[in-house]
Regions:
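N-terminal small-residue-enriched
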Residues: 1-447
Length: 447
């Protein structure tokens, strides 16, 4: 056995769902257990157990070893890990309002109030859906390099979706927020009237017009921009995708992949939803520069990919729970700000489209193609925002879009907390950007 890792995981969570003024769900749960990962005969083995008794851990260890030997007999690619820096640490992220200390009835009361604010905004509001989730996770990683780290992290998230209707026209407004914090997140969102904003958006979109169709210069807000960086580009820079031949930038290290004004980072040290101090291989988290001034300079790594690509791991391997092995994941991904004001960015556009709020997206990572449906937009004419637009979608080629970024703003914001799915594992992430401008984007949508 050349490598062994034991990872304890525990998550205590609660969730609430309110629909149209009725509390539909009030749940809570605990999951816990240990995952064992080994390299035996130069092959990976993994097994997990929900029971943490010595006998069950021994059984899981035997299963992991047996699995590695079975794989070795099949001639699967050899496993290898880079020798990591030894770490011994205990980290506890403190919440101002520990979710466990807030009475469930109080949580429901606040959610009902948020839902009511949205529901009573207008008689054109026809459906409201407000959800809440908190979770406190404990991860302990101990491996044969001598690393022993523990990290306790609270996360809280709230979401409000409002559907408006006028005749046959139906529109949706969405607001959400969260991060590494406690119930204070919900109090802040309540103060910011986030559910009212969702309702206001949905109702105003009823009087918006369909978008123009064609190829345009577009200006995108922080949410559209951040999620573009995460979905369209970030997954291409996860080293397992590179090694698996599924990345459009696999052979472009050191080459220009974007405009000179583009710098893209993934930074787990930022206190946002993707924040952590140690990844689930026990590696200390560091900021990762992926693209610097338009040039591809780095990938996100695990211990294995770092060994295979002769790189240094900076803390990018995480697992959903003890039941899964760590895989390479993004954390807080963003486009770094420059110095242009929003008004100046618009001023250079004779005719284009301003896009705000991501609704949904589809990315073909291997082909480098993206399609995004945004919440709303505005027509830009001679540097001024004009007609309000609904049902807007955009599509294009990722690398072409990055190279056609002609302006990057200074108004940086990271405010897209969510859960990113990959290989059956949902992991907390965040994304951000300043406003930025792209030429040559195909705009369309429902007419």
């Amino acid at each position: 056995m050349s490598f062994c890792e034991a990872r304890f995981f525990e998550e205590k969570s609660s969730n609430i769902v309110v629909e149209n003024g009725v509390a539909k769900t009030l749940g809570s749960g605990i999951i816990s257990g240990i995952g064992i990962r080994v390299i035996v005969d130069k092959r990976w083995g993994f097994a997990s157990t929900n029971a943490t008794t010595p006998a069950e851990v021994d059984r899981a260890s035997s299963d992991a070893i047996g699995g590695a030997r079975s794989i070795a007999a099949e001639g699967v690619e050899e496993a290898v890990v880079v020798n990591q820096k030894l770490a011994t640490d205990s980290v506890v992220h403190r919440a101002k309002m520990n979710p466990d200390d807030v009475d469930p009835e109080e949580k429901v009361r606040v959610l009902l109030e948020l839902d009511k604010v949205a529901r009573t905004y207008s008689d054109r509001v026809k459906d409201t859906f407000t959800t809440y989730r908190d979770a406190v996770t404990t991860a302990v990683v101990h491996n044969s390099f001598g690393t022993y780290v523990e990290e306790v992290t609270p996360r809280t998230y709230a979401y409000c979706r409002v559907i408006s209707k006028e005749g046959s026209n139906m529109q949706t407004g969405i607001e959400y927020g969260g991060g590494v914090a406690g119930f204070e997140v919900v109090n802040r969102l309540q103060d910011e009237q986030f559910s009212r904003r969702a309702a206001e958006k949905a109702v105003k979109l009823l009087s918006a017009r369909p978008p123009p169709t064609g190829t345009y210069t577009v200006v995108v807000d922080q949410r559209v921009g951040g999620l573009f960086m995460h979905e369209a580009f970030g997954h291409n820079c996860e080293a397992d995708s590179v090694l698996g031949g599924q990345s459009i930038v696999a052979d472009k290290m050191g080459e220009k992949v974007a405009s000179d004004i583009v710098t893209i980072m993934d930074d787990p040290t930022m206190p946002k939803n993707g924040h952590f101090v140690y990844d689930h291989e026990g590696v200390k988290a560091e900021p990762h520069t992926i693209v610097r001034d338009g040039t591809l300079v780095g990938f996100l790594h695990s211990l294995e990919s770092a060994a295979k690509m002769k790189a240094q791991p900076q803390g990018s391997a995480r697992a959903r729970s003890h039941q899964f092995p760590p895989i390479i994941r993004m954390s807080n991904t963003y486009l770094a700000p420059r110095d242009m004001a929003f008004e100046e960015m618009l001023g250079d556009v004779k005719r284009g489209v301003y896009l705000t709020g991501m609704n949904s997206g589809y990315v073909e990572t291997q082909k480098g193609q993206f399609t995004c449906r945004v919440e709303q937009g505005w027509l830009i004419e001679r540097g001024e925002l004009q007609d309000h637009l609904r049902d807007v979608s955009i599509n294009g080629l990722t690398l072409d879009a990055l190279k056609n970024i002609t302006a990057v703003g200074k108004d940086f914001k990271m405010d897209s907390p969510g859960t990113c799915g990959k290989m059956g594992q949902g992991i907390p992430t965040d994304a951000g950007a300043p406003h930025f401008r792209i030429d040559g984007i195909v705009v369309g949508g429902r007419q």
